[in-house]
Regions:
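A conserved hydrophobic position in a structured secondary element of the catalytic/binding core
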Residues: 143
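Short cysteine clusters
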Residues: 140
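Cell wall/extracellular polymer interaction/catalysis modules
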Residues: 1-137, 148-166
Length: 166
């Protein structure tokens, strides 16, 4: 089953509808590093990362790992580890995954720009927890924590996220 995400900030999954936040630049067909856009297309979910010091481990069929204080995600297009999880400190630019603001308490990693990784094509496209008021993201798709927990708990390997550009 597809989780259909559209430009109006609504995700539909079967009969369910969830509010979500998208990238500050909307949905684009050609994603570029730093453009603040959510990439259009079909995405698979590969694994779940979570802050077990803050939330109860979600029940999921996806591979699950506990986040650690030194976890990061490389966003430096010329680095060998571009668009990959890394340990901090790291020699290239990275986003810290262990955050104070709670948006990464539950992260679902997508398969965007992974096989192969293309420099400058975008990194760290996740499903994660929305900020208050569903403020725009840097390109990810963000949901209320309870909605994201539900999605993770009912996700099956054949399911996909379909991000539709108008």
């Amino acid at each position: 089953m597809d989780l259909l995400v559209t430009t109006n900030g609504i995700a539909e999954w079967g009969v369910r509808r969830f509010r979500c936040a998208l990238g500050r630049s909307g949905i684009v067909v050609e994603k570029r590093e730093g453009d603040g856009a959510t990439p259009a297309g079909t995405l698979s979910l590969s694994r779940v990362l979570c802050r077990l010091d803050r939330i109860v481990q979600p029940d999921t069929e996806l591979v699950l790992a506990a986040l650690q204080p030194d976890d990061g995600w490389c966003d430096a297009p010329e680095a060998a580890n571009y668009n990959q999880q890394v340990r901090l400190p790291h020699g290239a630019s990275c986003e810290a995954l262990w955050r104070v603001d709670r948006v990464y308490d539950l992260i679902v990693v997508t398969d965007f720009n992974v096989a192969p990784v293309v420099p400058h094509a975008g990194s760290a496209i996740f499903l994660h927890v929305a900020r208050p008021g569903y403020a725009p993201t840097e390109g990810c798709i963000a949901f209320a924590l309870d909605d994201l927990r539900l999605i993770v708990s009912e996700w099956r390997q054949a399911d996909r996220v379909r991000v539709a550009a108008d």
